[in-house]
Amino acid sequence: MFTQFDVLETIDMVEREHLDIRTITMGLSLFSCVRSTAEETAKNVYDLVCRRAEKIVKTASELSGEYGIPIVNKRVSVTPVSLISAAFPEKAPLIGKALDEAAATLGSDFLGGYSALVHKSTAAYERTFIKTIPEVLASTQRLCSSVNVGSTRSGINMEAVKLMGETFKAAAKLTAEKD
């Protein structure tokens, strides 16, 4: 049971100290979406994300109203796209755009997962995928990307670090006009 002090302290934190919940996240596996073509996979990805996360914004609003604490961002996070696009990495941007469209349909602030896990080594399909990141980030609004290039156990994949330097430079060039 909450005491009167607890309630007043919470109100004070929300009003004077601007307490909020920065982000709520729903994680989804996309492995069931993989098909023989990028186009079919992208369609399945869009459908699955829209179906499974359809209530994320409504639920966040209800929770915020119930507890009186603002929830700033609603985010969906998915399986790293490099894993589900391994058979057609040059067409991975189709999946990225489908994810961005799904985020817009849901009203989600961000959708994370246009990502690769190359901390141990970098396969040819992963290099090809990583080279698509600048194009995808330049042509989407809500999609987030990440590349894991190291870990305590595996060390740092310096080949991947070099590739990411080139990728950052290309992304900066393509998005120079954006804020």
Predicted regions and their residues:
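Acidic, His- and aromatic-enriched active-site or binding-groove loops in soluble protein domains
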Residues: P134-L137
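Extended, Lys/Arg-enriched charged tracts that mediate electrostatic binding to polyanionic substrates
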Residues: E159-D179
